[in-house]
Structures are given as C-alpha cells and as structure tokens.
C-alpha cells in the first residue's frame, strides 16, 4: 500500500465517523448547541471543529438520562 491509499482509507474512515451519531475521540456531543462536537478538556479543538453528532432519536429531547458528556469515552 502506498501513502496515498493509506491516506484515502483514513479519509473515508473520517467521513464515515462524521456520518455516525458519535463525535471523534476526545470530543463530546453538545446537544444544546445544535449537536456540534465540542472538545473535552485537553483535546485539540481542531479535532472537533466542524463535526456534528446525531442523537439516536433526534425527535425526542434527551433529559439527563443519556447525557453524552457524562459517558466515559474509550
């Protein structure tokens, strides 16, 4: 594999991650601010910049039961 195909594979993986409902590692889902990904403390803000998250059920408002900010990120 040359560097281009490795980069392309990584890029496709990045695109795939943005289409899912979760933010990149080190970012959390800010549902109050339009489902934008926000950096956790100590995370490079550019990692989360321009990324959005979709809640599993976007028609219902989540009230503390499933707050993504409190869940531990692997």
UniProtKB/Swiss-Prot annotation:
GO MF annotations, alphabetized: toxin activity
Post-translational modification: Contains 3 disulfide bonds.
Tissue specificity statement from the Swiss-Prot or TrEMBL entry: Expressed by the venom gland.
Subcellular location: Secreted
Signal peptide bounds: 1-22
GO cellular component, one term: extracellular region
Keywords for this protein: Disulfide bond, Secreted, Signal, Toxin
DNA damage keyword on record: no
Transmembrane is among the record's keywords: no
Protein family according to the UniProt entry: Belongs to the scoloptoxin-09 family.
Protein name, as recorded: U-scoloptoxin(09)-Sm3a
Originating species: Scolopendra morsitans (Tanzanian blue ringleg centipede)
